[in-house]
């Protein structure tokens, strides 16, 4: 009898400790969620404040009683934001597609094929990750200028069609596929390209999707490189448009209109993440496993 009572007390105590622990964890997670989401809230809040109301606030107000959508109109009328949006879409899709054409075969070659100097070449590839981005930007700018590709889509796209990090990530995932599958496919007369398309990519699909989404986000948020190689408005991206809206052509900073533009151009990325979030999580989880 006493043993049963002691067991019940121990079980209740364990449940209580578990509940308290979960409560503490959820409390800190809620605080962290508020910290992460607050910039988005502030961005949306600023976008619906009038220019006068925003500049008259000596103390920032966390709500607005007179919301306005005038800033969204200004964002599209002050600059040709719709055209910049299309340019960004072309740049993002083309760059991501070309990158996949380059990095997928490269990762497969390092993961599955045997050739002389493979380890040395891959080590040199990894060493490239140690080079600061600023140095690469300078070299790329000189190259693109010498090739007379400034103010062209090719000038925007070509420096971004490869990534050592993504090659490394895909290589590690491709190596997780059992060797027996590859040898069996070769016995059946399957070419390396067909094996890559029919076996490797379907198995590692979540990781490929993750790499694709990360590249899309990277291209969509590009700022430094487009500012360097484009001074023709016909090739401006949304990042250029936001900078133009900030000044608005009147020698003043129109922050509410700029925030409205940021909200508009952030929507595609948010939707993309929500649609593919399960694939992204699966790709990240697979990338963290070995063997």
Regions found by a protein language model. Give the residues of each.
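A structural signal for multi-pass alpha-helical bundles of membrane permease subunits
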Residues: 3-8, 13-17, 21-291
């Amino acid at each position: 009898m006493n043993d049963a009572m002691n067991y019940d007390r121990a079980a209740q105590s364990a449940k209580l400790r578990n509940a308290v622990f979960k409560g503490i964890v959820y409390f800190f997670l809620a605080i962290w969620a508020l910290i992460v989401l607050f910039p988005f809230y502030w961005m949306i809040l600023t976008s619906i404040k009038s220019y006068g109301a925003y500049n008259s606030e000596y103390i920032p107000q966390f709500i607005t009683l007179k919301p306005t959508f005038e800033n969204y109109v200004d964002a599209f009328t002050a600059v040709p934001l719709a055209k910049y949006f299309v340019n960004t879409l072309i740049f993002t899709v083309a760059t991501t597609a070309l990158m996949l054409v380059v990095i997928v075969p490269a990762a497969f070659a390092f993961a599955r094929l045997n050739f002389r100097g493979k380890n040395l070449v891959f080590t040199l590839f990894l060493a490239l990750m140690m080079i600061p981005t600023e140095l690469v930007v300078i070299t790329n700018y000189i190259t693109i200028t010498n090739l007379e590709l400034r103010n062209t889509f090719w000038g925007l796209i070509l420096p971004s069609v490869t990534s050592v990090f993504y090659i490394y990530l895909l290589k590690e995932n491709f190596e997780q596929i059992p060797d027996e599958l590859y040898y069996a496919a070769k016995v059946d007369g399957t070419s390396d390209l067909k094996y890559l398309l029919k076996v490797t990519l379907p198995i590692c699909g979540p990781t490929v999707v993750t790499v694709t989404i990360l590249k899309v986000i990277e291209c969509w948020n590009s700022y430094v490189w487009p500012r360097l190689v484009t001074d023709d408005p016909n090739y401006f991206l949304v990042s250029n448009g936001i900078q133009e809206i900030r000044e608005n052509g009147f020698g003043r900073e129109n922050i509410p209109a700029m925030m409205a533009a940021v909200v508009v151009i952030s929507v595609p990325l948010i939707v993309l993440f929500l649609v593919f979030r399960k694939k992204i999580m699966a790709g990240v989880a697979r990338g963290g496993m070995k063997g």
